[in-house]
């Protein structure tokens, strides 16, 4: 029996993780943490019976208590509660599926508590990769990627030497606006940007996919996970989302991982690695598929990807500035307060305006986030 704590249990990755667990009797959920979806969290507590449950805001605790007051479960809240869920003694592995930079501190604390990490929170490595990876090595903790692309790379590298990687080929669907030019995106509406062609995801990551900022974050994530510089991570548009990523080695051989676009596969792989379990998901029919196509990404139209490579090259707290600016800009767009093309412009502004810090601490990373957030909110 494996004991699991899930941070972000009511979100897209969290609910799919619970779906995987529901189909496997040998995983026990010991902690659940969510933001504001009280009723969803209460239903999960009733089904999975964890020892501890965390709700994001303290003022929501009374509502949660009315729904699960008869249950034998400890209720905590806020940032401290999230850390308690991440470090609960009985957990062997922590699924970090919270959205945004709030995932950094609980991930750090979970590693210090010697918990393996199933990582679905990009911002943790984008902003604090230099801290996370060295700490994981020091604490002898495994980090298993949950992103479909990074899981694919991880699978391609099984039995291979990291030093023999020539480059990583990170695939992208191209999103709903593939093939469009910047002028075509002037009047994009929220509903258009939320229509991803292949994947069912949360609202924020769906917008990030449409701007290709998500792929830029994945480039930075890959450099830390696999120990390669960002310039050796090449983005390739693969519209069918069948090849989830590839690795090219020194001898010219290329390894690829293929599969139907179903997030339960990388989630299950992270939970059970190195074992593979039966998963009732759609199988690839290569006769039906007939062909797989590739395209070069348009970095002028999708400036967010270009800015991510720039942030990776500059390093320090610049990836944090990019990420923080993107979080604010996407939230503004979701609230219909800015235009779609304002998103990359806001990111570029923040990257140029923030004071550079080399090798930032967690405190400096969070300070950069606040500075950038305040800077953008005062202007937009």
From Swiss-Prot:
Top EC group: oxidoreductase
Domain of life: Bacteria
Record field: catalytic activity: 2-C-methyl-D-erythritol 4-phosphate + NADP(+) = 1-deoxy-D-xylulose 5-phosphate + NADPH + H(+)
Sequence positions that bind 1-deoxy-D-xylulose 5-phosphate: 122, 148-149, 173, 196, 209, 214-215, 218
This protein's pathway: Isoprenoid biosynthesis; isopentenyl diphosphate biosynthesis via DXP pathway; isopentenyl diphosphate from 1-deoxy-D-xylulose 5-phosphate: step 1/6
GO biological process, one term: isopentenyl diphosphate biosynthetic process, methylerythritol 4-phosphate pathway involved in terpenoid biosynthetic process
Recorded GO MF terms: 1-deoxy-D-xylulose-5-phosphate reductoisomerase activity; manganese ion binding; NADPH binding
Known EC number: 1.1.1.267
Pfam hit, one: DXP_redisom_C
The keyword NADP appears for this protein: yes
Binding site for Mn(2+): 147, 149, 218
Binding site for NADPH: 10-13, 35, 121, 123, 202
Known cofactor(s): Mg(2+); Mn(2+)
Keyword annotations: Isoprene biosynthesis, Manganese, Metal-binding, NADP, Oxidoreductase
Similarity comment: Belongs to the DXR family.
Protein purpose: Catalyzes the NADPH-dependent rearrangement and reduction of 1-deoxy-D-xylulose-5-phosphate (DXP) to 2-C-methyl-D-erythritol 4-phosphate (MEP).
HAMAP family linked to this entry: DXP_reductoisom (MF_00183)
Protein known as: 1-deoxy-D-xylulose 5-phosphate reductoisomerase
Primary gene name: dxr
């Amino acid at each position: 029996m494996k004991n699991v704590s899930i941070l972000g249990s009511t979100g897209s990755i969290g609910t799919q993780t619970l779906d995987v667990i529901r189909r496997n009797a040998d995983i026990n959920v010991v902690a659940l943490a969510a933001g504001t979806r009280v009723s969803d969290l209460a239903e999960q507590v009733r089904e999975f019976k964890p020892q501890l449950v965390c709700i994001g805001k303290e003022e929501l605790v009374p509502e949660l208590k009315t729904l699960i007051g008869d249950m034998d479960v400890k209720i905590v809240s806020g940032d401290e509660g999230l850390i308690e869920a991440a470090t609960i003694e009985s957990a062997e592995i922590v699924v970090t599926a919270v959205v945004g930079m709030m995932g950094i501190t609980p991930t750090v604390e979970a590693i210090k508590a010697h918990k393996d990490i199933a990582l679905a929170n990009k911002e943790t490595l984008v902003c604090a990769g230099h801290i996370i990876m060295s700490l994981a090595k020091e604490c002898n903790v495994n980090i298993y990627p949950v992103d479909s692309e990074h899981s694919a790379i991880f699978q391609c590298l099984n039995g291979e030497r990291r030093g023999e990687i020539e480059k990583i080929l990170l695939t992208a669907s191209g999103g709903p606006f593939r093939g469009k030019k910047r002028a075509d995106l002037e009047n994009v509406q929220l509903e258009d940007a939320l229509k991803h062609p292949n994947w069912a995801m949360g609202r924020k990551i769906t917008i990030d996919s449409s701007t290709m900022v998500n792929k830029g974050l994945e480039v930075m994530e890959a450099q830390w996970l696999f120990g390669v510089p960002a310039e050796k991570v090449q983005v390739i548009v693969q519209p069918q989302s069948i090849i989830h990523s590839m690795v090219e080695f020194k001898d010219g051989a290329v390894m690829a991982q293929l599969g139907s676009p179903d997030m339960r596969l990388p989630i299950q792989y992270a939970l059970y690695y190195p074992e593979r379990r039966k998963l009732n998901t759609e199988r690839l029919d290569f006769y039906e598929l007939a062909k797989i196509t590739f395209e070069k990404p348009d970095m002028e139209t999708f400036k967010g990807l270009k800015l991510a490579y720039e942030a990776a090259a500059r390093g320090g707290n610049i990836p944090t500035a990019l990420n923080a600016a993107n979080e604010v800009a996407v939230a503004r767009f979701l609230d219909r307060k800015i235009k779609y093309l304002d998103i990359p412009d806001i990111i570029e502004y923040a990257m140029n305006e923030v004071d550079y810090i080399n090798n930032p601490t967690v405190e400096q990373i969070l300070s950069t986030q606040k500075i950038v957030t305040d800077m953008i909110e005062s202007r937009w």
